[in-house]
Amino acid sequence: MNNYDSEHKSNIDFKIMAFFFKIRDFFKDPMKKIEKVDLQKGDYILEYGCGPGSYTIPIAEKIGPTGKVFAADIHPLASEKVKKRADKNDLSNIDTITTDCKVDLEKSSIDKVVLIDVLHGLENYESHLKEFYRVLKKDGRLWVDDHHFDEQQIKSRILSTDLFRYVGKVDSLYEFQKVSL
């Protein structure tokens, strides 16, 4: 497959995924999940693997105009889709990042990292967890939800790096806290 074909397939795959997420979101309001994450007005959030922004918009609404969401995804169409949704919802507290790991944010600048249905797809999850650790503030939180993994798989991946400690679970969301090294 040449470069054009693989990029075209990737774009089609993203559009199909976005379509199915739109249907999912109609039946399962993303805000209901986000309400369970301990988000505060003014928080700085990294949503890694944001896709078309299903959870980005509710996060931005919950943290308000004094907060900031950094919506990161590997696919360039994710950035376009999130920007359009932010404009449609009159939200100016969302920045997008296209990346496969490094997010180019300052060290200790993020209150919480949110990973929803992403952990299973991270080929080198240790590198990602190190990057999340780097950008999280002291005692920052990592929230993970991934229906592809059971509880043991989620915990073992996150805890294997010794960068986070397990805090607890709220419904399908697992909370971890950055540890001091």
Located regions from the model:
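Conserved alpha-helix/loop element of class I SAM-dependent methyltransferases that forms part
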Residues: 24-43
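Conserved SAM/SAH-binding beta-strand->alpha-helix loop
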Residues: 75
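Conserved SAM-binding strand-loop segment of SAM-dependent methyltransferases
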Residues: 90-101
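A short acidic, Gly/Pro-enriched loop at the edge of an enzyme's catalytic core
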Residues: 102-113
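A short SAM/SAH-binding and catalytic strip from SAM-dependent methyltransferases
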Residues: 111-125
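Core SAM-dependent methyltransferase catalytic element
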Residues: 162-181
